[in-house]
From Swiss-Prot:
NCBIfam families: lipoyltrans. The keyword Endoplasmic reticulum does not apply. Its EC number is 6.3.1.20. This is Lipoate-protein ligase A. The keyword Ligase applies.
């Protein structure tokens, strides 16, 4: 019986694909070597310890229907679209070795006619007249008895959108998390016009089989039927939840300020695990009572636009004469924290 396993996802849902990856990783026998090939529609994928409000333009993501997905490995934020091919190599220890999986990807690229090399921060680069250009980035995760290496290859990604979503608004964030290093990148289509996701997957698969001297039939993973993976439903629910994707952010502080016709407002938030641990309001409004009440209501609540808006509007009952001010405040806060 082969020790290899090859899985190919036909889903573009990042939460589905990351849930599949997590389930396979947790449940695979320690003797198995796994290759999982997949890709995501418009998504910003952040590292396990990153702060989405720091890393991403979350407001523009919401406007453009771009998803946020937190992965279980470390590293920085990346934008995925269908111009990316994603790969995951898994193996038990002591056989797990990220240099092996890196070599397999380099061999696949070489077979396609691209000479690339490993570089620095877990990247694969190609030499161009303008200097080294990144075509692949990776991240890793290890437990006591197993490990995985996953990454992306840029085939025909929309690089302008990458800059849109990974450049955050100039907000006054004092984050305790990590801001990603931005890298100079290029698409493989610049080197191999017409290259497709299917061709890249085939090349990686062949290099995987060649390295281990075995072949195995591919398993197609699809959301049309629930994958036969123990605890998949629970894993998918967690992977797609606000609590995981946003709530796992490191502690940070956020200062919002705005001037309205009725006065200036400053809101200071301390946020931990997606919850507001402290809310302070400063204003030169002639009637500060609604804002003072708002600070008390926000304490302990979720740092989510809809929840903040809900708390603002709840004050209309106690302060009906300030309806105009509270509605303006509600709209501003909801937009500012997205």
């Amino acid at each position: 019986m082969s020790t290899l396993r090859l899985l190919i996802s036909d889903s573009y849902d990042p939460w589905f694909n990351l849930a599949v990856e997590e389930c396979i990783f947790r449940q695979m026998p320690a003797t198995q070597r796994v290759l999982f090939l997949w890709r995501n529609a418009d998504t910003v994928v952040i590292g396990r310890a990153q702060n989405p409000w720091k890393e991403c333009n979350t407001r523009r993501m919401e406007e453009d229907n771009v998803r946020l997905a937190r992965r279980s490995s470390g590293g920085g934020a990346v934008f995925h679209d269908l111009g990316n091919t994603c790969f995951t190599f898994m193996a038990g220890k002591p056989e797990y070795d990220k240099t092996i999986s890196t070599s397999i990807v380099l061999n696949a690229l070489n077979a396609l006619g691209v000479s690339a090399e490993a570089s620095g921060r877990n990247d694969l680069v190609v030499k161009t007249a303008e200097g080294d250009r990144k075509v692949s980035g990776s991240a890793y995760r290890e437990t006591k008895d197993r490990g995985f290496h996953h990454g992306t290859l840029l085939l025909n990604a929309d690089l302008s959108r990458l800059a849109n979503y990974l450049n955050p608004d100039k907000k006054k964030l004092a984050a305790k998390g990590i801001t990603s290093v931005r890298s100079r990148v290029t698409n493989l289509t610049e080197l191999l016009p017409g290259i497709t996701h299917e061709q890249v997957c085939e090349a990686i698969t062949k290099a995987f089989f060649a390295h281990y001297g075995e072949r195995v039939e591919a398993e197609i993973i699809s959301p049309d039927k629930t994958p036969d993976l123990p605890n998949f439903a629970e894993t998918f629910a967690r992977q797609s939840s606000w609590e995981w994707n946003f709530g796992q952010a490191p502690a940070f502080s956020h200062l919002l300020d705005e001037r309205f016709s009725w006065g200036g407002v400053e809101l200071h938030f301390d946020v931990e695990k997606g919850h507001i641990t402290r809310a302070q309001v400063f204003t030169d409004s002639l009637n500060p009572a609604p804002l003072e009440a708002l600070a008390g209501r926000l304490q302990g609540g979720l740092y989510r636009a809809d929840m903040l808006q809900q708390e603002c509007e709840a004050l209309l009952v106690d302060f009906p004469d300030q309806e105009k001010e509270l509605r303006e405040l509600s709209t501003w806060i909801a937009g500012a924290v997205r």
